[in-house]
Amino acid sequence: MIEAAYAQDVLPVWTEDEAGPYQTLPYPGYHWQPTGEPVRSAHEYTREGTAKQLTLFHPASGAVRVKGVRNCTNAIRHPWLQAELQAILAALPEPAEVLSPAENRRCWERWQGGLSVRITLPETLPPLRLLLVLDNLAGHLTPSLVLWLFAEGIMPLYTPLGGSWLNMAESIQRLLKRRALDGHHPQTPEEIIAWLEEAARGWNRAPTPFFWGGKRKARRERARQRRHALGGSGAYTERPLHPGRAA
């Protein structure tokens, strides 16, 4: 379902995630150093607290919205998420076509196809305007947040258990962390927060769109087509075997 959301271009897709905690310790990175004189990091570690990162990412444009925080409780995450989503919705054009209630409900239910456990949709639904990919965390399933998303025309798409790799926000968070922290030794959580948000602002000056699958996926699919699966296990051969052929 999430892969289908990435592939379509009718509804905007945003992804949400949290990264961290990041500690006040040296982060390894790449340096130019004279031969025999490697970079030396301080061995002392003073516990000054940690920082986390809240992320909203739009793969189609590459735009990212980031906020650094000390804690990531629902009381902190939900208001930030709601404010950012309202700003995103305000920038979207109003739906050009007015659908009947039945057609509108089918648009929402289309994104629940194939799920074994489905969230109950409200009786009255606004026009569907945005798809939001979220990790399957308890904080993302609170009734107040889910009902707010529905009221705003946002359909949450939750990653399955062990399926966080379906959330493209994971990739942008890894990139921003490397740009912000690698090769540095932050002394305070506030310094970590400032560097993470600065890295996001720098990224947004020239964002790079993300695409699902791409050339690597096409190569993997071609490789699988050249393989011949065997029964009984996950084994395969590079040429077909005829079951009636004698050894």
Where are these regions (language model features)?
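Mobile genetic element proteins and their domesticated derivatives, centered on retroelements
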Residues: 15-17, 56, 62, 81, ...
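Active-site proximal helix-loop segment of RNase H-like, two-metal nucleases, encompassing DDE(D)
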Residues: 64, 155, 170-191, 202-204
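Short beta-strand segments
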Residues: 14-16, 130-135, 157-160, 211-214
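RNase H-like polynucleotidyl transferase catalytic core
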Residues: 37-46, 151-168, 184-186
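Short, basic/hydrophobic alpha-helical segments
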Residues: 76-128
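C-terminal domain-tail junction helix/linker
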Residues: 194-247
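Acidic, metal-coordinating catalytic cores used for nucleic-acid/nucleotide bond scission
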Residues: 72-73, 101-108, 132-143, 161-166
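Extended, low-complexity cationic-aromatic segments
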Residues: 1-91, 95, 223
